[in-house]
Amino acid sequence: MENVFDYEDIQLIPAKCIVNSRSECDTTVTLGKHKFKLPVVPANMQTIIDERIATYLAENNYFYIMHRFQPEKRISFIRDMQSRGLIASISVGVKEDEYEFVQQLAAEHLTPEYITIDIAHGHSNAVINMIQHIKKHLPESFVIAGNVGTPEAVRELENAGADATKVGIGPGKVCITKIKTGFGTGGWQLAALRWCAKAASKPIIADGGIRTHGDVAKSIRFGATMVMIGSLFAGHEESPGETIEKDGKLYKEYFGSASEFQKGEKKNVEGKKMFVEHKGSLEDTLIEMEQDLQSSISYAGGTKLDSIRTVDYVVVKNSIFNGDKVY
């Protein structure tokens, strides 16, 4: 694996602009049978998404994935979303009761449009078996499987029946897998994405390590169809986390999915908790992301997201911020 780099090591090179205004650029993306306004999905984490935000996103044509940390609420959630004519997109784990849950959905003729199998180390027989189980009982559901960090894993999960794979092991801001285990794609997530995308025949969701809106464009350049983002979506008015005031400033909590705060216990901890500055409304962030991505498309010399996939780039080894703190 030569040529290892991460988001801050790369600059995309502009191509001749063909639009008069960035508003002519189209940021929509298709995943499965549905088209979404942005190639971005808030992380399926407890401090990022809840039922209210899921509903808001679905109503406004953004992709979402509900977290799996209140498993007993999932059936009513699917019913509720579908009764409003919205997509139902849920997460499952790989434990025994999740197999029963999938069978229960089939028995009740409930088919979520999207099911994400979401475990920290997704290149495993446990995930392969779950993909096959879902495909057997709910063949119409679009299955996203992860998380993985190698081309072998992408190929195996696709061959097992996954409709998309989620790439990223530990690059997230509240993820400490890299520190606790020594493993993962932290520090080279963008190169890992590129490596995996070359092997993929189905969509890839880049998950983790996004620190700026420009990183979304870079992810698209290196093969992502969709980009999952945690920290940039944390700390909004609507976010589920707790709000605290410190030195006259407002902050919201944000913690990792395998953290003791989420589990309620100190066992197999691979996540930490932090407080992020209160960011105002989620809608404003989504609009800003869309506008920034429209600008990216115009710099790429096109009118659609795909134009970003063919631009040239340079590797600048950690120098693009010149020591400036951006956010």
Swiss-Prot record:
GO function terms (MF aspect): GMP reductase activity; oxidoreductase activity, acting on the CH-CH group of donors
Active site, per annotation: C175
Biological process (GO), any one: purine nucleotide metabolic process
Enzyme class: oxidoreductase
Biological role: Catalyzes the irreversible NADPH-dependent deamination of GMP to IMP. It functions in the conversion of nucleobase, nucleoside and nucleotide derivatives of G to A nucleotides, and in maintaining the intracellular balance of A and G nucleotides.
Assigned protein family: Belongs to the IMPDH/GMPR family. GuaC type 2 subfamily.
Protein name listed in UniProt: GMP reductase
Gene name as annotated: guaC
